Amino acid sequence: MFITNEHVGDRSRMEDWRIRGYDPLTPPDLLQHEYPLTPESQKIIVEGRNAACDILNGKDRRLIGPCSIHDPQAALDYCERLYQASEKHKGELLIVMRAYLEKPRTTVGWKGLINDPDIDGTFHINKGLRIARKLFVQLTSKLPIAGEMLDTISPQFLSDLFSVGAIGARTTESQLHRELASGYHSQLDSKTVPMVLWVLPLTPLRAASHPHHFLSVTKPGVVAIVGTDGNQDCFVILRGGKKGTNYDAKSVQETQEELIKSKVVTEMKPGPRIMVDCSHGNSNKDHRNQPKVAQVVAEQVAGGDKSICGLMIESNINDGRQDVPPKEQGGKDALKYGVSITDACIGWETTEEVLEVLANAVKTRRSL
């Protein structure tokens, strides 16, 4: 129930005169009780976390590979396809489904399934959280999933379902998000959930490895001061940028040297800590270039590179992207099935081809 602020627009008020009102938020523990983890989900999540950490720490020689979701049914369809691929390549690839439900925005636009689940500007966030948790419980009955952390509150509703967490490119320089990464943890065991940090230099990654204190909420929804231990299982993603692409061997080597210089990689922690984003700047924002990026990285892996822990691919059932039609033209009901409404993605057939290339690269590296 939305509680309207009767003083909105009244500049004589000391506070909240720009606030239209409030909608009470469902407490995290209530939502977790409503959609609890199943034994199957718990097993897959923990195994995914442990495997990801083993890869980062050099104990597992596979590669790890994690677009925003707007259609839960299509997400389940995609998950089933990805599960079949993961079974095929499980000896070489740890496949983690990228299940991002919130979309960080540089300006404005649809902010994701949690923020606006009906894709019509109604912002039924409580509904979005319920859809999100129900969907994640279903997805994790098949595969481990990766999620992006945009604030310090939503993880309390969903983080127990993630095997890999991400702090996005727009937020790695934010002190609050570094603090969040330092305490991003498993609710199921004592192992820290691996965290992705997207940018160079490596200051955010070093900061996340240290203890911090920050404001958040508890499971019952009470505001609290959170103290963290620090996260030793962080890794960096190379996504390209204003200076060009950075998936080539020279860029990877320079990043590895920075990781060693920053003591993120040491003799005691020699595992690979570099993931390559095949999309965004590395694809020059053309999704059709993602397989080309993957091929170049696969060649590095096949040649014996041990600093690359994985790749990130923006993939969907069908390729490309689409805009949400105006309401008078059907709105979200007129959307094409399995096509992204945010970043453009490669389709399923191309995804299968890329996974095959990566799996073969791992096999070649093992034979060296």
Swiss-Prot record:
UniProt pathway annotation = Metabolic intermediate biosynthesis; chorismate biosynthesis; chorismate from D-erythrose 4-phosphate and phosphoenolpyruvate: step 1/7
Q: What is its EC number?
A: 2.5.1.54
* Superkingdom in the source lineage: Eukaryota
Q: Spell out the molecular function terms from Gene Ontology.
A: 3-deoxy-7-phosphoheptulonate synthase activity
Q: How is its activity regulated?
A: Inhibited by phenyalanine.
Which key words are in the record? Amino-acid biosynthesis, Aromatic amino acid biosynthesis, Transferase
Catalytic activity, as annotated? D-erythrose 4-phosphate + phosphoenolpyruvate + H2O = 7-phospho-2-dehydro-3-deoxy-D-arabino-heptonate + phosphate
Task: Show the InterPro entries listed in the entry.
Answer: Aldolase_TIM (IPR013785), DAHP1/KDSA (IPR006218), DAHP_synth_1 (IPR006219)
Gene Ontology annotations for the cellular component aspect, listed alphabetically: cytoplasm
Output the GO biological process annotations, alphabetical, semicolon-separated: amino acid biosynthetic process; aromatic amino acid family biosynthetic process; chorismate biosynthetic process
Asked whether the keyword Transferase is assigned, the reply is yes
Q: What does this protein's UniProt record list under function?
A: Stereospecific condensation of phosphoenolpyruvate (PEP) and D-erythrose-4-phosphate (E4P) giving rise to 3-deoxy-D-arabino-heptulosonate-7-phosphate (DAHP).
In the record, the note on similarity to other proteins reads: Belongs to the class-I DAHP synthase family.
- What name is this protein filed under? Phospho-2-dehydro-3-deoxyheptonate aldolase, phenylalanine-inhibited
What species is this protein from?
Candida albicans
